[in-house]
A protein has these predicted regions:
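Short, amphipathic alpha-helical "recognition" segments used to contact nucleic acids or chromatin
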Residues: 72-86
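C-terminal structural segments of small proteins and small subunits
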Residues: 99-122
Length: 129
């Protein structure tokens, strides 16, 4: 049986930074990777060429390991559940992810670049703006 800790609120590292711009908080955690590199631009362009779920599945099957794809899918589902008000313990039990993963997703939802919010809004029928 999976045992999870229940957590509420933000990770300790974010306490006291509510006044900082979200982009600055996000940069504090993601400084070692260049999200604007030519390789990332190429990946984004490749994703934007995909037109159907079948094309997307085929590309992801070629590009990602099963574990990587499962991790990405679990993170997106965790983001959906967090945005619907589910708590860490419920998400941990349902998805089998660690509270550390849920905490990272929560941090990105609240202080990230806005990618989760855009995708979730569009999946729910909004424009994501």
């Amino acid at each position: 049986m999976l045992k999870c800790e229940s957590r509420t609120g933000l990770p300790i590292a974010l306490n006291g930074v509510d006044a900082a711009p979200k982009s600055e908080v996000y940069k504090m955690f993601d400084t070692s990777f260049d999200y604007n590199s030519e390789m990332v631009d190429r990946l984004c362009a490749a994703l934007l060429t995909l037109k159907t779920p079948e094309e997307c599945r085929a590309f992801l099957a070629d590009v990602c390991t099963i574990g990587e794809l499962q991790d990405i899918a679990q993170r997106l589902t965790a983001a959906q559940l967090l945005s619907r008000g589910r708590n860490y313990q419920q998400i941990c039990a349902e998805l089998g992810v660690s509270t550390a993963t849920i905490s990272r997703v929560n941090r990105c939802l609240n202080y990230g670049a806005g990618g989760y919010k855009t995708v979730l809004a569009r999946l729910e029928g909004g424009d994501g703006q």
